[in-house]
Amino acid sequence: MKQDSRFPNLFILDHPLIQHKLTHMRDKDTSTRTFRELLREITLLMGYEITRNLPITTKRVETPLVEIDAPVIAGKKLAIVPVLRAGVGMSDGLLELIPSARVGHIGVYRADDHRPVEYLVRLPDLEDRIFILCDPMVATGYSAAHAIDVLKRRGVPGERLMFLALVAAPEGVQVFQDAHPDVKLYVASLDSHLDDHAYIVPGLGDAGDRLFGTKN
């Protein structure tokens, strides 16, 4: 895991397996089926990395030999909140890693001026819960920042929120950081820039279209 000095709340997950799978996802000739499988696999690997600092407590258990105080994750079960629609493809990998997690959804689409338009919010109970929000792309950063706003407006503090994405543009990371300097943003790659259509370069195309086999 490494950081970029420009963005103190950005963490780049540079594990070789994550980078290997991301390269195959970038390839324009990767099939929908393979893209979907890779998204699940890479999200599972990234989920392992971002949960390494979860709070721990102990639980009394009896092994076949003795009783011990053994470590377990403290507090309520985690919640996974994909940003629709492409974020849904990331929830499978996270649920494979954390099968007891609660799942919410935030529906946001990008208007012609690239600003987010919210159309759906479904969340589990919020008290004392850690939330992992996920969307494959942080392009302009407005949708990601808006999704965090949804939780904060309902009283969830920044220290109980994290955002997980595959690739991000510096422009989007700056927007996210300006809006939520107290929320950690985890990505597999910080790419070069946004083009004139607000697509990430080099990026991996439209993640939703590639995941579901649709045409923009």
UniProtKB/Swiss-Prot annotation:
Q: InterPro entries in the record, alphabetically?
A: PRibTrfase_dom, PRTase-like, Upp_B, UPRTase/APRTase, Ura_phspho_trans
Q: Name one GO molecular function term.
A: magnesium ion binding
SUPFAM superfamilies under this entry?
A: PRTase-like
State where 5-phospho-alpha-D-ribose 1-diphosphate binds. R85, R110, D135, P136, M137, V138, A139, T140, G141, Y142, S143, D206
Which positions bind uracil?
I200, G205, D206, A207
Give the protein's cofactors: Mg(2+)
Paste the cofactor note. Answer: Binds 1 Mg(2+) ion per subunit. The magnesium is bound as Mg-PRPP.
Q: Which GO terms describe its biological process?
A: UMP salvage; uracil salvage
The annotated pathway is: Pyrimidine metabolism; UMP biosynthesis via salvage pathway; UMP from uracil: step 1/1
Reaction catalysed by this chain?
UMP + diphosphate = 5-phospho-alpha-D-ribose 1-diphosphate + uracil
Activity regulation: the record says: Allosterically activated by GTP.
Top-rank taxon: Bacteria
State which Enzyme Commission number(s) the record gives: 2.4.2.9
Q: Which UniProt keywords apply?
A: Allosteric enzyme, Glycosyltransferase, GTP-binding, Magnesium, Nucleotide-binding, Transferase
Q: Which family is it part of?
A: Belongs to the UPRTase family.
Q: What does this protein do?
A: Catalyzes the conversion of uracil and 5-phospho-alpha-D-ribose 1-diphosphate (PRPP) to UMP and diphosphate.
Record-linked NCBIfam families: PRK00129.1, upp
Q: Which PANTHER family match?
A: ADENINE PHOSPHORIBOSYLTRANSFERASE, URACIL PHOSPHORIBOSYLTRANSFERASE, CHLOROPLASTIC
Protein name (Swiss-Prot/TrEMBL)? Uracil phosphoribosyltransferase
The species is Burkholderia pseudomallei (strain K96243)
Gene symbol of the encoding locus: upp
